[in-house]
A protein has these predicted regions:
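Short helix-loop "hinge" at the ATP-lid/N-box region of the Bergerat-fold HATPase_c
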Residues: 87-88
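Short helix N-cap motif at coil->helix boundaries in the Bergerat
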Residues: 118-126
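Conserved micro-motifs of the catalytic ATP-binding
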Residues: 22-27, 66-71
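Short conserved segments within the C-terminal catalytic ATPase subdomain
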Residues: 48-60
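Acidic ATP/Mg2+-coordinating residue in the GHKL
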Residues: 114
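Short beta-strand/loop element within the Bergerat-fold HATPase_c
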Residues: 96-106
Length: 186
């Protein structure tokens, strides 16, 4: 039997997807530190017992600087968790995952990249056009693919941001997220 905590988390995650699919805005917008939220998301993955085939590196583009925005902390951590776990899921032989955060042109920036197998060019085009992502069931009949990235795009849109997908050099995937910064509320 599935532990109750797991069931609650799964049901809660479904609610997030449903809320966003029906264009309802997240209700918990608050002043938050983007650097700290990103660091927490990376720490949560590392503390969940990450397999030794994977390495996650966290970097601040402007070290020691906090970046504030109005956002839903839980949704933004979920977005980063989905991106990191997407790299893990699609690179079963392991990879190095880099999460870099900072400010660029008045926006909070986050770049999640890996040196894994990358993504097919046609799928990359579909993602960047913002077309509806169809989920596919993996050969193991358990893992659905596509829902994590769909949720990422919905969370970014709900925060009035942009997301782009590109090949990482020399191979792998790079996801670039830009969210509007907000002044610190006093």
């Amino acid at each position: 039997p599935m532990p109750m905590k797991c069931c609650i988390k799964t049901a809660s995650g479904f609610g997030v997807t449903t809320k966003l699919e029906y264009a309802l805005q997240p209700v918990h917008f608050q002043d938050m530190d983007w650097v700290e939220t990103s660091r927490q998301a990376v720490s949560e993955v590392l503390n969940s017992g990450l397999d030794s085939r994977y390495e996650i590196v966290f970097a601040e583009m402007q070290p020691g600087r906090s970046l504030h925005l109005l956002g839903d902390d839980g949704l933004l951590r979920r977005m980063l968790d989905n991106l990191i776990r997407n790299s893990i899921t699609h690179n079963p032989h392991g990879c190095r995952i880099s999460v870099s955060v900072g400010e660029e042109k008045g926006h909070c920036l986050c770049i999640v990249s890996d040196d894994g197998i990358g993504i097919e060019p046609e799928r990359l085009k579909v993602l960047n056009r913002g077309d509806d992502i169809t989920s596919t069931q993996g050969s193991d009949e358990k893992n659905e693919h596509g829902l994590g990235l769909k949720l990422v795009m919905q969370i970014v849109k709900a925060h009035r941001g942009t997301v782009s997908f590109s090949d990482s050099t020399p191979h792998g995937l790079e996801v670039r997220i830009s969210l509007p910064t907000q002044p610190l509320i006093s």
